[in-house]
Amino acid sequence: MLAFNFFGATEGGLFDINATLPLMAIQVVALTYILNSLFFKPVGNVVEKREKFVSNNIIEAKNKLSEVKKLEADLLTQLQSARTEAQRIVSEAENESDKLYKEALELANNEANASKEKARLEIESQTSAARDQLSKQADDLSELIVNRLILEK
């Protein structure tokens, strides 16, 4: 057997170089190939798939987040316009109710004034009728007094 003695090593030591060295090299290459094909490639593929999955999920999440922010901004704009519209409607309703109140008040005042005027005219009419009646009674009474005085004389 051919053996090389490195650094004063004896046969059967750690660095024996003999016919088993090529066999060991072949075993290491075969083990590397087997481990690579059976373990490292599948694990690497799983890791790559997982990284792609995670990166796709991150990209999708960013897209959805930007979409949500856009929708939120749109909803805030719609909410603000709805609030403005509601305030406008409330303001119009208040103005309309004020207008109706003023119209009703004016109508009530007009009716009250008309009733008051009617009552005044009726009172004047009754007063005039009472004066006419009183005047007629006074005339009748004075005529009666004159007739009695004339008859007594």
UniProtKB/Swiss-Prot annotation:
Keyword Ion transport: yes
One Pfam entry name: ATP-synt_B
Bilayer-crossing regions: 23-40
GO cellular component: plasma membrane-derived thylakoid membrane; proton-transporting ATP synthase complex
Bilayer disposition of the protein: Single-pass membrane protein
UniProt key word Transport: yes
Gene3D superfamilies: F1F0 ATP synthase subunit B, membrane domain
Keywords for the protein's UniProt record, in alphabetical order: ATP synthesis, CF(0), Hydrogen ion transport, Ion transport, Membrane, Thylakoid, Transmembrane, Transmembrane helix, Transport
InterPro entries: ATP_synth_b, ATP_synth_B-like_membr_sf, ATP_synth_b/b'su_bac/chlpt, ATP_synthase_B_chain
Compartments it resides in: Cellular thylakoid membrane
SUPFAM superfamilies hit by this protein: F1F0 ATP synthase subunit B, membrane domain (SSF81573)
GO MF, any single term: proton-transporting ATP synthase activity, rotational mechanism
UniProt similarity note: Belongs to the ATPase B chain family.
UniProt function note: F(1)F(0) ATP synthase produces ATP from ADP in the presence of a proton or sodium gradient. F-type ATPases consist of two structural domains, F(1) containing the extramembraneous catalytic core and F(0) containing the membrane proton channel, linked together by a central stalk and a peripheral stalk. During catalysis, ATP synthesis in the catalytic domain of F(1) is coupled via a rotary mechanism of the central stalk subunits to proton translocation.
Subunit text: F-type ATPases have 2 components, F(1) - the catalytic core - and F(0) - the membrane proton channel. F(1) has five subunits: alpha(3), beta(3), gamma(1), delta(1), epsilon(1). F(0) has four main subunits: a(1), b(1), b'(1) and c(10-14). The alpha and beta chains form an alternating ring which encloses part of the gamma chain. F(1) is attached to F(0) by a central stalk formed by the gamma and epsilon chains, while a peripheral stalk is formed by the delta, b and b' chains.
Name the UniProt record assigns to this protein: ATP synthase subunit b'
Species of provenance: Prochlorococcus marinus (strain AS9601)
Upper lineage: Bacteria, Bacillati, Cyanobacteriota, Cyanophyceae, Synechococcales
